[in-house]
From Swiss-Prot:
This is F420-dependent glucose-6-phosphate dehydrogenase. Keywords: Carbohydrate metabolism, Oxidoreductase. The keyword Oxidoreductase applies. It comes from Beutenbergia cavernae (strain ATCC BAA-8 / DSM 12333 / CCUG 43141 / JCM 11478 / NBRC 16432 / NCIMB 13614 / HKI 0122). The gene is fgd. The active site is at H38, E107.
């Protein structure tokens, strides 16, 4: 079954506002809410960065049905993977069957400002792989002893583990981490707007390859994608809203070494609107909007989490509930 989620953008909204939008999302019929976990936002002006862990506890207490998770949290530097394992086990006890841990390898802007080292890509991947293994071992075992290169445990126990296991989703944008997601994850996370070939020729084949190493197929995984969408009856307004998230359009080369939100904002604001909009499905017609979204379902994604860039999230949620979600559900019924 296709799941439709809401991205709670912690880089843009204060924690209480984000909580209110999460409650609205549940009322509007969304199936899930995934929150980002940043130490620092992409923009200094008007930026926010509430901590995901306490926020998820409040979200669990304020909702009844939606799946809640991170998209994503980095369990390698400012968080020790053992602390992450304990925190999400506790969340799983408090909201049984409604919590997911989404992990990624991170960005220097969330680690270096605390004086933490930012290793090269090879070490970051090795840390990431080892952190996932420790989290899963702590969730599964009574007493865990591991002597790793980066993380160790000696007779470590998580005493409060949920009866319903917490799924672990692995975010990736390249083939190596995507193979890891297929091999060890319960789900896979990526983002939209990067060109069809990346998904069909690189990521999904790598995911299938990794799954096969664990005697699984893609049907055994939740294929989640963050959908960057800007939908508004006023097309110019939909375009302009993408400027709030111009940093997403910066290349990795343009962002390398940029760890200050003030500088990131300066670089993003220098981009033309055509470029800031390049990562987004920008639409003023609901049928055209759904058609463009559906192309990702046709690729094989089973869980679409919608991220809208505008300040008025209540208006986005209302419009999506009235005009987009019903069309997507109807489309799903037609093809099932």
């Amino acid at each position: 079954m296709l799941r439709l989620g809401y991205k709670a953008s912690a880089e843009q909204f204060a924690p209480r506002d984000l909580l209110a939008y999460t409650v609205l999302a549940e009322q509007a019929g969304f199936d899930s809410v995934f929150v980002s976990d940043h130490l620092q936002p992409w923009r200094h002006t008007g930026g926010h960065a509430p901590a995901a862990l306490p926020w998820l506890g409040a979200a669990a207490a304020s909702t009844e049905r939606v799946l809640l998770g991170t998209s994503v949290l980095t369990p390698t530097l400012r968080y020790h993977p053992g602390v992450v394992a304990q925190a999400f086990a506790t969340l799983g006890c408090l909201a049984p069957g409604r919590v997911t841990l989404g992990v990624g390898s991170g960005e220097s802007m969330n680690e270096a400002p605390l004086g933490l080292p930012w290793p090269d890509g090879k070490e970051r991947y090795a840390r990431f792989r080892e952190a996932i293994a420790l989290i899963q071992a702590l969730w599964a075992g009574e007493r865990v002893t591991i002597d790793g290169t980066y993380y160790s445990a000696r007779d470590a126990t998580i005493y409060d583990r949920p009866d319903v296991p917490v799924p672990l989703y692995v975010a990736a944008s390249g083939p190596s981490a995507t193979r890891l997601a297929g091999r060890v994850g319960d789900g896979f996370i990526c983002t939209s707007g990067k060109g069809r070939e990346l998904y069909t020729e690189t990521l999904l084949p790598a995911l299938a390859e990794g799954a096969a190493k664990s005697d699984r197929t893609l049907a055994d995984l939740d294929l989640m994608i963050e959908m960057k969408v800007s939908y508004d009856p006023d097309h110019a307004r939909a375009l302009e809203a993408t400027r709030n998230w111009g940093a997403l359009a910066l290349t990795s080369e343009e962002k390398v070494g940029v760890e200050d939100p003030v500088e990131m904002e300066r670089l993003a604001d220098a981009l033309p609107t055509e470029r800031t909009a390049s990562r987004w499905i920008v639409s003023d017609d609901p049928d055209e909007h759904v058609e463009r979204i559906w192309s990702y379902v046709e690729m094989g994604f089973t869980h679409l989490v919608f991220h809208d860039p505008r300040a008025d999230q209540a208006a986005f949620l209302e419009r999506y509930a009235e005009e987009i979600l019903p069309r997507l559900r109807a489309r799903e019924r037609q093809v099932s």
